[in-house]
C-alpha cells in the first residue's frame, strides 16, 4: 500500500493459538470455554435489528472479558452501565483485582507504587542491568534486574527507550534500526449515533456488548484494504457533550443532546495503516516534573484510513436508518483509543525493534511486553492479543532463565 510501512508479523496464528486459549480462560472471555454471551441491552437490540435488515450475519453481543455469570471468584455483570468508569462489581476483568493480588499472594511479586522509571541501565557489554526510578518523594532509586520487561504502552515505552540513551546507545536502547517510536497506530475509529422517536436509554447495560463483524475482511472493492468492526457504544452525558460534535454550539447541537434518552450509538474500529511518519519522539524543550523530556506524538491519517472511515460511517448510518432513525450523527475519531506500534515486532532486526518473543533485537535481556510490539493493528480490540503475547513471552523468559540463557 503506497505510503504505508506494512510488514508481516514474524509469528503465525498457530504460534499464538495456544496462548489465546490461555488468555481466554484467564480473562473469562464470553462465548469461549462454555461461558455464555452477555445479554443484549436496548442499544444492542436496535443495533441488531438494523444490522439484520442490511443483511449482516455476524452480529452478537461480542466476546467480552465481562462475566455473564459468576466466574473466577467474581460476580456476574449487573448491567448497571457506564463501564468506561470502571466496574464496581468486579465483573469486568482487570489485572488490578485479579492477577496482581494473586501474584502478591505468592510472595514472588512486589508492586512499588508511586515509582516513575527514569531510565533503563546497562553494563559495558550492552546488557541491561536494571532500572533507575523516582520514588514518591522524588528521590532516585535503583533496582537491579536480570531481565527487564517494558510495558508502558505505545507512548511511554518508546519514550523510556529513547530517554535511556547513552554513549553506547546514542539513539536510545534497542534502536539500531531507528524504528523505536516509529509506526504508531491507534486504530481507525469514529462513531455513529442516532435519535429515535422512542427511548432507547443506551447507557443501561454493558456499554460495548454488541458487534457486527461482517466488514472485518479484506475486500478492496470497497475502496480500501483491511477491514473494520462496528460495536455498540453508549457514552455518559459529559462524554457525549464533548465528542458528539466537538466545538459545536447552537440549537442543532443542543437539540441533539436533548434527544439523549432516545439515542442509540455505535463505535467504529478498524485497521489503520502503519506509517513511519506516525511516531513518538522526545521533546527536549518540555520536561516532566522529574526533568525528563516528554513525548511528542505525531499522527496523520493514511488515505486508506479515511476511505475506511467513510465507508463505516455510511454503513453505520444505514444500520440505524433501516430501523427508523430520525437523525444520525457521524462523529469524529477519538484522539487515541488503542495505542499500538512504536516498538514493532519483525523477523529482521533492521525492520523493527523486537523479535517474535518481544525480545529486543539489540539487547537479549530486554523485552517489550505491551501493544507497542504490534506489527499491524488488525480490526480487533487488542487486549486479548496483548495478554496472549505476554503469557507467551513469560513462558519464553522462564524457559531461557532456567537454562541460563538469560
Residue locations for each model-derived region?
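Glycine-rich loop(s) and the adjacent beta-strand/alpha-helix scaffold that form part
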Residues: 106, 115, 119-123, 131-204, ...
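A glycine-rich dinucleotide-binding beta-alpha-beta segment and adjacent secondary-structure elements
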Residues: 60-62, 76-83, 118-121, 261-272, ...
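FAD cofactor-binding and catalytic pocket of flavoenzymes
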Residues: 9-13, 177-295, 303-306, 339, ...
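A non-catalytic, amphipathic alpha-helix used as a structural packing/dimerization or gating element
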Residues: 11-22, 311-318, 392
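Hydrophobic (often cysteine-bearing) scaffold residues that line and stabilize catalytic clefts
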Residues: 40-43, 92, 96, 308-312, ...
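A short acidic-Thr-Gly-centered motif at the start of a beta-strand
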Residues: 99-105, 137-142, 345, 351-361
Amino acid at each position: 500500500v503506497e505510503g504505508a510501512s506494512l510488514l508481516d508479523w514474524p509469528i503465525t496464528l498457530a504460534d499464538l493459538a495456544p496462548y489465546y486459549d490461555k488468555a481466554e480462560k484467564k480473562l473469562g472471555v464470553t462465548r469461549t470455554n462454555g461461558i455464555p454471551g452477555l445479554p443484549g441491552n436496548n442499544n444492542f437490540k436496535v443495533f441488531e435489528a438494523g444490522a439484520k435488515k442490511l443483511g449482516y450475519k455476524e452480529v452478537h453481543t461480542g466476546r467480552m472479558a465481562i462475566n455473564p455469570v459468576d466466574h473466577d471468584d467474581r460476580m456476574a455483570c449487573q448491567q448497571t452501565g457506564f463501564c468506561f468508569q470502571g466496574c464496581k462489581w468486579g465483573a469486568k476483568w482487570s489485572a488490578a483485582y485479579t492477577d496482581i493480588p494473586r501474584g502478591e499472594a505468592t510472595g514472588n511479586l512486589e508492586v512499588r507504587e508511586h515509582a516513575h522509571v527514569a531510565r533503563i541501565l546497562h553494563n559495558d557489554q550492552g546488557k541491561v542491568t536494571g532500572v533507575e526510578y523516582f520514588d514518591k518523594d522524588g528521590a532516585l532509586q535503583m533496582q537491579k534486574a536480570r531481565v527487564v520487561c517494558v510495558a508502558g504502552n505505545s507512548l511511554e515505552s518508546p519514550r523510556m527507550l529513547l530517554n535511556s540513551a547513552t554513549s553506547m546507545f546514542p539513539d536510545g536502547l534497542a534502536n539500531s534500526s531507528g524504528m523505536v517510536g516509529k509506526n504508531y497506530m491507534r486504530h481507525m475509529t469514529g462513531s455513529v449515533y442516532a435519535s429515535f422517536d422512542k427511548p432507547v436509554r443506551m447507557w443501561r447495560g454493558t456499554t460495548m456488548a454488541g458487534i457486527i463483524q461482517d466488514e472485518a475482511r479484506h475486500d478492496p472493492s470497497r475502496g480500501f484494504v483491511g477491514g473494520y468492526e462496528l460495536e455498540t457504544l453508549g457514552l455518559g452525558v459529559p462524554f457525549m457533550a464533548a465528542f458528539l460534535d466537538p466545538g459545536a454550539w447552537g440549537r442543532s447541537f443542543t437539540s441533539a443532546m436533548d434527544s439523549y434518552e432516545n439515542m442509540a450509538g455505535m463505535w467504529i474500529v478498524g485497521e489503520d495503516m502503519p506509517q513511519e511518519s506516525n511516531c513518538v519522539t522526545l521533546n527536549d524543550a518540555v520536561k516532566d516534573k522529574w526533568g525528563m523530556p516528554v513525548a511528542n506524538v505525531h499522527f496523520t491519517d493514511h488515505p486508506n484510513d479515511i476511505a475506511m472511515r467513510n465507508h463505516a460511517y455510511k454503513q453505520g448510518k444505514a444500520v440505524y436508518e433501516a430501523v427508523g432513525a430520525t437523525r444520525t450523527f457521524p462523529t469524529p475519531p477519538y484522539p487515541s483509543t488503542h495505542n499500538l506500534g512504536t516498538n514493532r515486532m519483525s523477523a529482521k532486526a533492521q525492520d523493527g525493534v523486537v523479535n517474535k518473543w518481544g525480545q529486543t533485537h539489540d539487547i537479549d535481556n530486554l523485552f517489550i511486553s505491551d501493544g507497542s510490539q504490534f506489527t499491524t493493528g488488525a480490526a480487533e480490540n487488542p487486549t486479548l492479543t496483548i495478554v496472549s503475547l505476554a503469557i507467551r513471552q513469560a513462558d519464553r523468559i522462564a524457559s531461557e532463565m532456567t537454562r541460563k540463557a538469560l
